[in-house]
Amino acid sequence: MHPFDIRTILFAKHAQHVVLIHFPIALFIIGVFFDFLGQWKRQQLLAVAAYYNLCVAAIATLPVVVTGIVAWQWELEGQKLKGILLMHLVMGCVSSVLICLVWFIHMRTRREQEDLPGYRLPIEAAAVGIVALTGHLGGFLSGVNG
């Protein structure tokens, strides 16, 4: 197995998920950071940066969920989920829904030209925590965290 062999890159049993997952995590966390900073500094430009980061993060969750399910099917041949893998799958789905919810709140208020609601900030903070916990569980599955 050669690290630059295209077949190795494209057809490794779970490599795509491991590579793709970092994009929505990073985009979401920095989007929430920009939103909190924009709220604190009252700068519209930061709110715009937050919106676009959250938008791309929401879009990026789709291939991540698909590759996660494919990795489960290929790597474990569709075995019954249990333990950390089950928690990771459930938390991954919850994380994806929360990322999309946060983006939807921003998109709706942007489209209707309203001020962003204050209730979004605790939702965003909780979502960052859930995303981080999901990533932590994924690290255990990949062997990075233990």
PLM segments and residue spans:
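Polytopic transmembrane helical bundles with strong interfacial aromatic enrichment
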Residues: 1-146
